[in-house]
């Protein structure tokens, strides 16, 4: 940042703004929504007839951020309904879904039910939580850029971020970008929808599963039961990941993947 001349950060995420203001207050920031509100002839590509605005918890004490979003919504023809309570957690925060799924579900349902109107949000996590609850919901940027009413998997979001970085590096700096290469990248996973959704709920991405299988294969670790189902583990910091899988000619079929906040060490006798 200093080498680049201490530029202003343009932020679309209230959490990013909150963390930067706390930890690196010397960085000047401006919300993307304020800048967009100054652009002429904005295109409305995916509007609702009416909507309620849901403020993320990180914007609870950020009057400027909330106001920028409301002014931009008005540019799109909205006078969004205000919810009776603002700035409450949608359920995503604190890894609640992994630590206490029942509490997460209860909170997400309660927040989704605060209004019968569709929600207009400006937090990617809020968007995902409400779409998974079947609540009509759009990020305010979708009104400008077009919408896709689905929740993407972790590995899809990671791949998209790499594509965005590659495009920006080429367009803004005329430099190539080569994503990091891992020894397990060539592993092919076969994952049923239900298993993939269970992995998502536990914040386990495909790369972690690939690494776990690769380490077990290279180190000769893991277990195999009488039915040919393999069990392998991967230790990272305070987390231990477990993967059950079978080998097929087409790739590794994942039976299940789970994790816990526990490490274990092998002790030589």
Residue ranges and their predicted role:
Residues 1-183:
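Iron-sulfur cluster-binding electron-transfer modules in prokaryotic oxidoreductases
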């Amino acid at each position: 940042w200093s080498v680049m001349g201490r530029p202003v950060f343009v932020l679309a995420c209230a959490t990013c703004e909150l963390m930067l203001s706390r930890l690196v207050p010397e960085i000047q920031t401006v919300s993307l929504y304020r800048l967009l509100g100054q652009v002429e002839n904005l295109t409305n590509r995916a509007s609702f007839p009416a909507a309620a605005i849901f403020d993320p918890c990180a914007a609870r004490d950020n009057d400027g951020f909330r106001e920028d979003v409301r002014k931009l919504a008005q540019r799109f023809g909205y006078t969004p309904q205000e919810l009776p309570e603002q700035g409450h957690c949608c359920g995503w925060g604190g890894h609640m879904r992994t630590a206490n799924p029942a509490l997460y579900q209860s909170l997400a349902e309660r927040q989704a039910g605060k209004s019968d109107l569709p929600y207009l949000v400006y937090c990617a996590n809020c968007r995902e939580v409400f779409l998974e609850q079947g609540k009509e919901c759009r990020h305010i940027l979708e009104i400008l850029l077009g919408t896709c009413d689905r929740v993407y998997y972790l590995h899809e979001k990671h791949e998209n971020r790499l594509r965005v970085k590659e495009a920006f590096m080429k367009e803004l700096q005329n430099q190539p970008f080569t994503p990091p290469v891992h020894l397990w990248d060539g592993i092919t996973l076969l994952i049923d929808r239900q298993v993939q959704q269970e992995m998502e709920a536990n914040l386990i991405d495909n790369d972690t599963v690939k690494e776990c299988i690769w380490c077990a294969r290279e180190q000769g670790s893991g277990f195999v039961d009488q039915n040919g189902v393999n069990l392998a583990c991967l230790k990272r910091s305070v987390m231990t990941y477990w993967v059950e899988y079978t080998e097929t000619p087409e790739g590794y079929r994942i039976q299940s993947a789970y994790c816990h906040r526990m490490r274990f060490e092998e002790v030589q006798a």
